[in-house]
Amino acid sequence: MLRWLFAITLFSLGNLTPIHAEVIGREGQGWLERENGQLILHLKGSPREMGLQHGRLLKDHIQQNLKTLLEIKGNQALVDFGPLKLKPRTAIEAIIAIQRAHVPDWYLEEIAGLAEGAEVPEMDALVANFIPEMFHCSGFALMNSATADGTLYHGRVLDYATDWGLQDHALVLVAEPEGGIPFVNVTYAGFVGCVTGMNVHNISIGEMGGGGLGHWHGVPMAVLMRQALQTCETFDQTIDLYRTSPRTCQYFYVVADGKTNKATGMEASWDRFELVLPGVKHELLPEPVHDCALLSAGQRYQLLVERVKEQHGQITAESALKLMDRPVAMKSNLHNVLFEPQTTRFWVSHAGSDGTPAADRPYNAYQLSELLSRTPDRKDAN
């Protein structure tokens, strides 16, 4: 079960601390660097070009990641698919056949380029990129009077199978799509879609899933998130994209806009669209807290409510990070991200190779505007 936590809160983290970065590969307009142990992948160009850059610069990582996902773990697990229990690949191939009519050409072109560059079968790359459709999530949001200052903050906790080794292929992916909006995607080698991201127009988006398995006739969740980041400049445009697009299953989202200091949760399911406003009671959220949208379930939801109430009006950067500590973050905590959309700053922590939860590991600090200003020839990269 894939569970993801989101936070939107208001506070400020201090200045970014420059860290030595090393350029380790180039391909066309794309390039790869390593900073403080974290891979940062820069992609630029057409969908095909970006896919080729991704595949060639991270060929070994992609081959290893897909082998684990599709051959090793994919042959061990069974998933529910209607009344049947199927291996994940079999189920995903059936989903692809249903959803293909709703997948934009640019997405398939980028996956084809990635497969060519990484020297993997195109169907393997396609199946891996549809894995997020099998899983569902949870989340929370805090803002305005709930915090110590007025800076909009959007945080995210991803809990998912650290024993699958995704953290060994973790990326900060900085994309400049031809004709589109530049954005950052916190992701893994071989993945083209997005589940955690922010663009240069100060829009950040996160996803959390519910039920509705089997309702696949729509745009895949990770594709829709990626599309929003590279096409939407405003809060209203983002909401309208979700409202008007054919959707799948039951998904909840958090959308934040640093330009207007505005954020909301929303349900964008196959048959329902509803904004989940901060501080407003919802049938799934029985304990509303002023200026907060706490989207989670069970004991984790109760703990979030307790933590937020205890610090309401006093939440700072440090205390906001603590809101996402275990057991709000599960033992399988794969990555944590905090976005400050107004400044495009963000902080990332990944699980350790030994399975140490991301919440128990240090954060690396970045700023999207600064990442986009970098070149592989800059002196401070050597």
Outline where the language-model segments fall.
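Sec/Tat signal peptide C-region and signal peptidase I cleavage site
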Residues: T17-A21
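Gly/Pro-rich turn-and-neighbor structural signature
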Residues: L114-G117, E122-R156
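C-terminal, well-structured catalytic/ligand-binding subdomain of enzymes
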Residues: E22-E110, L114, S145-Y153, V157-N382
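Bacterial N-terminal signal peptides
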Residues: L5-N15
